[in-house]
UniProtKB/Swiss-Prot annotation:
Keywords: Disulfide bond, Knottin, Secreted, Signal, Toxin. It comes from Lycosa singoriensis (Wolf spider). The lineage of its organism: Eukaryota, Metazoa, Ecdysozoa, Arthropoda, Chelicerata. This is U1-lycotoxin-Ls1c. It comes from the Eukaryota. Belongs to the neurotoxin 19 (CSTX) family. 04 (U1-Lctx) subfamily. Residues 1-20 form the signal peptide. Expressed by the venom gland.
Length: 107
């Protein structure tokens, strides 16, 4: 009986050790991922800034992520170029207005 308890204790120790090693590896990978996300967040394009070269890099606003909105600009030479900026789409503006109004009414 004593041998069985020793073997079970040994197995539990080995399993907990191996799982903690896996958890440590997982935590390290997760930490690296979070650091990469933080770096990306620092490099996002603010509202009203140009996003022509980085159309998916707009920052987050109060409720929604800003969208890269593009327009075609005709230069004096007659060339058409696309210019983009990060902004809030009209349906997001409406949602923010409703939420703000609701907060004023309901506290």
């Amino acid at each position: 009986m004593m041998k069985v308890l020793v073997v079970v204790a040994l197995l539990v120790t080995l399993i907990s050790y191996s799982s903690s090693e896996g958890i440590d590896d997982l935590e390290a990978d997760e930490l690296l991922s979070l650091m990469a996300n933080e770096q990306t967040r620092k490099e996002c394009v603010p509202k009203h800034h140009e996003c022509t070269s980085n159309k998916h890099g707009c920052c987050r606003g109060n409720f929604f992520k800003y969208k890269c909105q593009c327009t075609t600009v005709v230069t004096q030479d007659g060339e058409q170029t696309e210019r983009c900026f990060c902004g809030t789409p009209p349906h997001h503006k409406a949602a923010e207005l409703v939420v703000g109004f609701g907060k004023k009414i309901f506290g």
